[in-house]
Amino acid sequence: AIGIGISGNVFQTRAGLGSSGSSLLLDEYGTNNKLAYSVRKLRTAYTGSCMRVRNGSSVELDIGFDASGNLDESALLTHCGAGDGFVVKWYDQSGNGGTMEQTIDIPQPQIVSSGVVLKDNGKPIITGLSDLSTNQGTFLELITPKTTYLPSTGQYFFFSVTKTETTRSILYCEDRRLQLIAQSTSTSTNTRNDPNYLSNTYRRNGTAYTPIDRADVYTTNSSQNLMTIDGSLDNSISSFFLGYGTSFFANWSMQEFIVYEGDKSSDESNIETAINGYYLIY
């Protein structure tokens, strides 16, 4: 069962809390979980690090969680000092080993700026960046082959705590099948280049969401939100990215990204409530 507490006017489930001694999200909702990335610990049995970070001296270090199950900011700042920190790897907490990584410096998303942990609503955030000089945006790539972690063609559910940080960004993609294209000045109604999506595809902060165009995707998601997607993946495509990387299209800035295989509609609202219980988005 999920315990419920009250903080101010916000109901919080135990599965949404990150403090020690409380039930973690994937302890309650771990069935058919295929990938799980977060700035907090999601599963009690997970003993690995949160992410691997490169500092301004190009030294890489795995950063774990503190005693409360949150990203260890003390260790992170000791590593980065007064400089910047960039994400080399974001470790999968599902137990399946699907690390997201970026080994090239320029496309690495940022987590520390000038000795300060980047945050949104009080929680660390992996921040997307665009580099006009190289025509690149930041992105993280799932270690191939993708089918090891996302084995079947068909229905998947995606839960992401995220925001559009740059004027051009893409939530995720398979090869060139792009999902939720945010572009600040574009009136294109092509907000995804992927036909494999089901009815009622999107929910934003627990309610149905239908973007009008790419500019609408950018503006309506420019602050922290919980995006839920009921979609499909194709196991004939070997690549999977958070972000895109070319034509200045970066990753959406992100705090959490969780993927389930199969139909999770019966748990959808409960998972959203649990996630919101930790991040206090809406």
Where would I find each of the regions flagged by the language model?
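Short tryptophan-centered beta-strand motifs in secreted/extracellular beta-sheet-rich domains
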Residues: F157-F159, P195-G231
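Enriched but not universal
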Residues: A1-A45, D267-Y282
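Extracellular, beta-strand-rich glycan-interacting domains
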Residues: G5, K41-G56, F65, K89, ...
